[in-house]
From Swiss-Prot:
This is Nucleoside diphosphate kinase. The gene is ndk. Disulfide bonds: none annotated. Major role in the synthesis of nucleoside triphosphates other than ATP. The ATP gamma phosphate is transferred to the NDP beta phosphate via a ping-pong mechanism, using a phosphorylated active-site intermediate. Pfam families: NDK (PF00334). One of its GO terms (biological process) is GTP biosynthetic process.
Length: 152
């Protein structure tokens, strides 16, 4: 597998409920590298652009209002297979269907307050990273324990 990047956002409910460090810890324990991190209250425009694929869905307005209602922790994680692995760490969009041990399975119960967003593919990851981060906000660095996490 090649090294890739994904966009992860801890939504306002996850921030307000104090899960930021726990969620970051799960990604670090998995062995992924954090290359971008910021906290912001997204504008309505940013939220609309981010969730544009859902523009015609009946829940779009509520989703935009929710995401822009409070602080979001936006992150870029890097590593081999990080997109698929992050999706597994996060769990099903519907928390009550999420497996125990996943972020949503352990920490959420309502689809409208499911704590976290993660890119669902390479194209989406690139779009979301470019939407939320400027190139200068991403940090290129090498972890000192890389040889202990991967043969490659």
């Amino acid at each position: 597998m090649t090294k890739e990047r994904t966009f992860i956002a801890i939504k306002p409910d996850g921030v307000q409920r104090g899960y930021v460090s726990e969620i970051i810890g799960r990604f670090e324990k998995k062995g992924f590298k954090l290359v971008g991190l910021k906290q912001l209250i997204p504008s309505k425009e940013l939220a609309q652009n981010h969730y544009g694929v859902h523009r015609e869905r009946p829940f779009f307005g509520d989703l935009v209002d929710f995401i822009s209602s409070g602080p979001v922790v936006a992150m870029v994680w890097e590593g081999e297979g990080v997109i698929l692995s992050a999706r597994k760490l996060i769990g099903s969009t519907k928390p009550l269907e999420a497996e125990p041990g996943t972020i949503r399975g352990d920490l959420a119960i309502d689809i409208g307050r499911n704590i976290i967003h993660g890119s669902d593919g390479e194209d989406t990851a690139k779009f979301e990273i470019d939407l939320w981060f400027n190139e200068e906000e991403l940090c290129e660095w090498e972890t000192s324990d890389l040889k202990w996490r991967s043969e490659n």
